[in-house]
Amino acid sequence: MIGILDYGVGNLKAFANVLKDLNFRNQIVKTEQELKSCTKIIMPGVGSFDSVMDKLSESGIRDVLSDLVMSKKIPVLGVCVGMQILASSSEEGTKSGLGWIQGKVKKFNFDQSNSLLTVPQIGWNEVTSIRDNKLLLNLEKNPRFYFLHSYYMECEEDNDVIAFADYGGNFTCAVNRDNIFGTQFHPEKSHHNGVALLRNFASL
């Protein structure tokens, strides 16, 4: 069972619909008991870093989530701000992140040479894979995904980065450490490439 984590933020039904079309059992989960029945977890996230961390803490499931991911090694996929909270901290706020992947979330800060670029980045962008990874199997070369964000993760360990995109310079847009995965882009909004990526995650 794939659990789509409902902690008050994120586009939950879009993930559920894609997974249903792919014939993967899934449910939107809110409670500890529901979460414990999951074999994989998707963490959507929309909003600010601090508000998402607050929502996760207020939900009462943070400790169980950490146990499932860090001790029982259940695969987890963080999306957009759901990926950012995998990091240790963010320039956007003062809260600590989950710290499952060491790094800091930074804001796009363009000089005059990139003055035509807007923040947030909204729309489609090519993604370049750095290394072979189960999450990115069978995607077309330089696939395009949908982005909507002002911040990006800067990892301390290069090996945690599996893909980057270019927006005024290269930035990390997908990460993986052991059973922990993250995408800055929105696979649930990215048509066939997003469907392929979610199929890969669901098949782990």
UniProtKB/Swiss-Prot annotation:
Pathway note: Amino-acid biosynthesis; L-histidine biosynthesis; L-histidine from 5-phospho-alpha-D-ribose 1-diphosphate: step 5/9
Spell out the PROSITE patterns in the cross-references.
GATASE_TYPE_1
Stored InterPro entries: Class_I_gatase-like, GATASE, Imidazole-glycPsynth_HisH
Q: Where's the active site on this chain?
A: 80 (nucleophile), 186, 188
Q: Which GO terms describe its biological process?
A: L-histidine biosynthetic process
Q: Name one GO cellular component term.
A: cytoplasm
Superkingdom per UniProt: Bacteria
Q: Name one Pfam family in it.
A: GATase
Q: Which UniProt keywords apply?
A: Amino-acid biosynthesis, Cytoplasm, Glutamine amidotransferase, Histidine biosynthesis, Hydrolase, Lyase
**Where is it chiefly localized?**
cytoplasm
Provide a Gene Ontology MF annotation, just one: lyase activity
Give residue ranges for domain Glutamine amidotransferase type-1.
1-204
User: What reaction does this catalyse?
Assistant: 5-[(5-phospho-1-deoxy-D-ribulos-1-ylimino)methylamino]-1-(5-phospho-beta-D-ribosyl)imidazole-4-carboxamide + L-glutamine = D-erythro-1-(imidazol-4-yl)glycerol 3-phosphate + 5-amino-1-(5-phospho-beta-D-ribosyl)imidazole-4-carboxamide + L-glutamate + H(+); L-glutamine + H2O = L-glutamate + NH4(+)
Subcellular location field = Cytoplasm
EC number, as in UniProt: 4.3.2.10, 3.5.1.2
Task performed by this protein: IGPS catalyzes the conversion of PRFAR and glutamine to IGP, AICAR and glutamate. The HisH subunit catalyzes the hydrolysis of glutamine to glutamate and ammonia as part of the synthesis of IGP and AICAR. The resulting ammonia molecule is channeled to the active site of HisF.
Could you give the subunit structure recorded for this chain? Heterodimer of HisH and HisF.
Q: What is this protein called?
A: Imidazole glycerol phosphate synthase subunit HisH
- Gene responsible for this protein: hisH
